Each structure stands twice: as structure tokens, then as C-alpha cells.
Design a protein with these regions (language model features):
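Peripheral, non-catalytic segments flanking oxidoreductase cores
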Residues: 1-323
Length: 323
């Protein structure tokens, strides 16, 4: 059974007039309210860039474990670098008690700050040789797309189109390339490729491939539904900060990545390319003026964007309880 994730064409928003922009915004807003997820097409990201980045990252994950671990930070946190298998459990952010997730990742964060020579540097593998160029180009494409999505969101929420612009001049944007290897051994009871969780930030941009054992979302009746990949689409979903901004109108939907069926033969390897986007870390996230009134007062206390996300990241590594 499949819960339909709406497909929203951004062509009218990016290339149309006022009517086309509003129509796309309204469709996007409905999807965020009803499902918390949408698949976008007509987004303007070059297919060749996606293919080249995917190929390059897959080559990185094909290297021996010892070679990949050269780019693991000593503390093995989720901030940046190579994250080996089984070092996190995202279900812990919801007080879940599940075995570690069956995935490995390569993470890049705060590239804008790194380019200016400030903040922590990322871990840049030497192989493949073109990886740094591909990652930087993909980051720029995701940054541009994130800003378009926030303009779209502002219109959908009856705000001026540039409402979020000050918070997204240098936003929080983390690229996470996730490899779900073939499962040679059966998972432990309750163990998934990626446990059930909500995303923490603003909007998440996901490119997923065709492989068994994929993304599922949970509906209001606690039933799980597959989210099929789109050949040229990105899956967009609402994170906690965006939901708090909208007073819960936009849903931060529970989701997970399931294991492939054990009876399958052949490779079930899966690679996902994720851009976690959100406002600048100094932003105070409080209810938007168009999302509350006398009958619908603010449901959430204001939070600092960076502090909120960091508490969730720490919990996923069992470093501290989530707030």
C-alpha cells in the first residue's frame, strides 16, 4: 500500500509569472500540511550534476574500510567526515531503543564558512580525485534550491516572498551522502537501515535511488507507506524547526529507511544524497505571524535553531538526551 506523496512542479514558480508562482506555492503548501512530504520536479538542478555526484560518492564508498576511516573525526560525531557503520541510532532522538542503524555516511557541513576560512574544516578524501569539485558544485546547487524553496514556502504561508531571506544568506546546510550496503547478515530484531525519526531542521532535500529497502513515512493511523523514487525528482520534507515556525500546520512526519527483503538475490545496495537545510544557527525560531491567531495561539516556545538541532544530533549518538 502506498500513501501518495504529492508531486509539485516548480517550473511555474521558477519560470512563470505571478499566477504560476502562486499556484506552485499553494500546491507545495498543501503537500506540507497534508503529508509533510512532496516530490518536486522542474527544480532546475542539472541531471548531469546529480549523476556525476552520485557516481563519485559511490566510488568513495567502494573503497576499503581502512581507507575510508582515514577521514573519520576522532570523536566520530555526526558533524562532518566519514561515519562508519553502526555508530548512530536516530530512533534515540524519540527515546527509541533500537540497535545501531545499518548505514555509513560521508558528511560535509558549513561549506560557505569553510570557503571564507572560518569555522571547522571538513574532511576531504583524496580519492576519488574529483570528489571535492563535485561536492562543492552539488552544495551550490542545493543552496540555490533551498533558497527557492524558502521563497516558495513564504508565498505558501501568505508571507512576503523574501521573508526568510535574512535567515538564509548563510544558512545551515549539511550534505549527507548515505550508503546502505548489502546486508550479508540478518539484522538484529528492531534494527533498520535508518530508524524512525523526525528531521530536525527546516526543509530536507533528498535524492534517492531505485533499490530495495527504501524510504517509508508514517500516516496519522501509524501505518507505514513507501515513498517511491522519482527519476528526476527530489523528495522534500518538513523538519522540526519548519513545523515549529508554522505552529504545527506543516507536518514534521515520522519516517524511516527499511531493510530489503531477505529473500532477494543480487545487490540491494542503496545510496541517498541528502541536504539538510535550515536557518542560520543564530536564528530564533518562533511562530510565524500568519500561523497564529486568537483561536490558534502559538503551540511551541521559541528556540535557538543551532541549539535545538545540536541536541537532536547528540541524542542520535546517545551523547545526551534530546530536548
Amino acid at each position: 500500500m502506498t500513501l501518495a506523496v504529492p508531486v509539485v512542479d516548480l517550473g511555474g514558480f521558477l519560470h512563470g509569472g505571478r499566477a504560476g508562482r502562486l499556484a506552485a506555492a499553494q500546491a507545495f503548501g498543501r503537500a506540507m500540511e497534508e503529508a509533510g512530504f512532496a516530490t518536486i520536479t522542474g527544480h532546475g538542478v542539472a541531471p548531469a550534476l546529480v549523476r556525476d555526484t552520485y557516481r563519485c560518492v559511490r566510488e568513495f564508498f567502494a573503497q576499503p574500510e581502512q581507507q575510508k576511516r582515514r577521514h573519520t573525526p576522532p570523536e566520530q560525531t555526526k558533524g562532518r567526515g566519514y561515519l562508519p557503520m553502526k555508530i548512530e541510532s536516530v530512533a534515540a532522538t524519540l527515546d527509541g531503543r533500537t540497535p545501531p542503524d545499518l548505514c555509513e555516511a560521508l558528511v560535509f557541513a558549513s561549506l560557505q564558512r569553510e570557503r571564507r576560512g572560518v569555522g571547522l574544516p571538513n574532511y576531504w578524501p583524496e580519492e576519488p580525485t574529483e570528489l571535492a569539485a563535485r561536492i562543492n558544485a552539488y552544495f551550490d546547487a542545493m543552496l540555490a534550491l533551498a533558497r527557492h524553496l524558502m521563497q516558495l514556502s513564504a508565498l505558501a504561508l501568505a508571507l512576503p516572498e523574501d521573508w526568510f531571506a535574512p535567515m538564509y544568506r548563510e544558512p545551515s546546510l549539511t550534505l549527507r551522502f548515505v550508503n546502505y550496503p548489502d546486508q550479508e547478515e540478518p539484522p538484529e530484531p528492531g534494527q533498520l537501515r535508518y530508524g524512525a525519526h523526525h528531521d530536525y531542521g527546516g526543509l530536507t532535500i533528498l535524492r534517492q535511488d531505485e533499490a530495495p529497502g527504501g524510504l517509508q513515512i508514517c500516516d496519522a493511523e501509524d501505518v507505514w507507506h513507501d515513498v517511491p523514487p522519482h527519476p528526476d525528482g527530489f523528495v522534500i520534507n518538513v523538519g522540526d524547526l519548519m513545523s515549529r515556525w508554522t505552529n504545527g500546520r506543516w507536518r514534521s512526519t515520522l519516517h524511516r529507511v527499511v531493510n530489503p527483503p531477505r529473500e532477494l538475490t543480487g545487490s540491494t545496495q542503496r545510496l541517498s544524497m541528502v541536504a539538510f537545510t535550515g536557518p542560520n544557527g543564530a536564528t530564533e525560531v518562533a511562530c510565524l505571524p500568519t500561523c497564529a491567531d486568537a483561536e490558534h495561539p502559538p503551540r511551541f516556545a521559541p528556540v535557538n535553531a543551532q541549539a535545538y538541532v545540536q541536541s537532536k544530533l547528540a541524542a542520535s549518538h546517545a551523547l545526551a538526551p534530546a530536548r
